[in-house]
Amino acid sequence: MKFLDQAKIYIRSGNGGAGAVSFRREKFLEFGGPDGGDGGRGGDVWVEAVNGLNTLIDYRYQQHFRAKTGMHGMGRNMTGGKGDDVILKVPVGTQIFEEDDETLICDITEIGQRYRLAKGGNGGFGNLHFTTSTNRAPRRANPGQEGIERTIWLRLKLIADAGLVGLPNAGKSTFLASVTAAKPKIADYPFTTLHPNLGVARVDGREFVIADIPGLIEGASEGVGLGDRFLGHVERTRVLLHLVSAQEEDVAKAYQVIRGELEAYEHGLADKPEIVALSQIDTLDPEARKAKVKALKKACGRDPLLLSAVSHEGLNDALRQLASVIDQSRAAEAGTAEAEE
């Protein structure tokens, strides 16, 4: 399935149905009074999060959505039926913005969550509403109210517990494939990963979701390489696993480049808990490994994890550390929620 994480669409709620001009027509009743019913309300436009979606690709092929007009009123004081709604089905994690692409309308974070983006127009009054003491047979009815039209942006920010960051070819996709059932594209050239991938990891009876995003390079915040647009997909994570390839000539610089891009992106990414790991260590001899571990430790201020997807060295340790941070974050979040109640 192709991946699309943003789409610009046009929506319009339905017009209200027109009120009816009608009079009672009954045997032995020469001058029946007005009995024109009201028009029905126009259909609404809703957005709803559904299970099983992780892309906005459907909105590449259809960008215009219009709800139905309400039914017109009828005689015998019958109100017209409501127009059919339009429901925009989106993945969990979708944000809806105004046309300026800055004003947030809503953030859809749970399956089944709905939000009304445009309310249908009210139906017009039938002639029964216009009866007065001096006008017992009005021939007037209102048209329905027009629907609301607006242009909006849909932006998807995947919801994951942990995010993988690093330079291209740092081994992020290989790590994801080794610890989850995800099958990202893996090859020995930069930018093999062109869109985010998700996988569910399990360790010690616990499970959590990991997001792998395309690699960053120096200047990504200014649009170099694939830019930093995919960093939005790790904004919601609780912890970052920062992979630095053992094949880098200067592991300290590789670490600092990514930290610089996280800080330039802002949105709190640089403040997230971070676990640092030296990946692809199976490519080093013991002496080179020791030197690179020392250099990376000096750069990040802590002992890095040592990982190899080939020999599986350190994979479970990494998962346990991620799970521990995620558990602490969830517990703190639950405590905050209880305190607010």
Curated annotation (Swiss-Prot):
Enzyme class: hydrolase
Record domain Obg: where: 1-159
Localization in the cell: Cytoplasm
All copies of domain OBG-type G, residue ranges: 160-327
Named cofactor requirement(s): Mg(2+)
Residues the entry annotates as binding Mg(2+): 173, 193
Signal peptide: none
Enzyme nomenclature, EC number: 3.6.5.-
Chief location bin: cytoplasm
Residues binding GTP: 166-173, 191-195, 212-215, 279-282, 308-310
Superkingdom to which the source organism belongs: Bacteria
Pfam families, per the entry: GTP1_OBG, MMR_HSR1
Keyword annotations from UniProtKB, A to Z: Cytoplasm, GTP-binding, Hydrolase, Magnesium, Metal-binding, Nucleotide-binding
GO biological process: ribosome biogenesis
One example GO MF annotation: GTPase activity
GO cellular component, one term: cytoplasm
UniProt entry tagged with the keyword Nucleotide-binding: yes
Functional note: An essential GTPase which binds GTP, GDP and possibly (p)ppGpp with moderate affinity, with high nucleotide exchange rates and a fairly low GTP hydrolysis rate. Plays a role in control of the cell cycle, stress response, ribosome biogenesis and in those bacteria that undergo differentiation, in morphogenesis control.
Family that this chain belongs to: Belongs to the TRAFAC class OBG-HflX-like GTPase superfamily. OBG GTPase family.
Quaternary structure annotation from Swiss-Prot or TrEMBL: Monomer.
PANTHER family reported for this sequence: DEVELOPMENTALLY REGULATED GTP-BINDING PROTEIN-RELATED, MITOCHONDRIAL RIBOSOME-ASSOCIATED GTPASE 2
Protein's name according to its UniProt entry: GTPase Obg
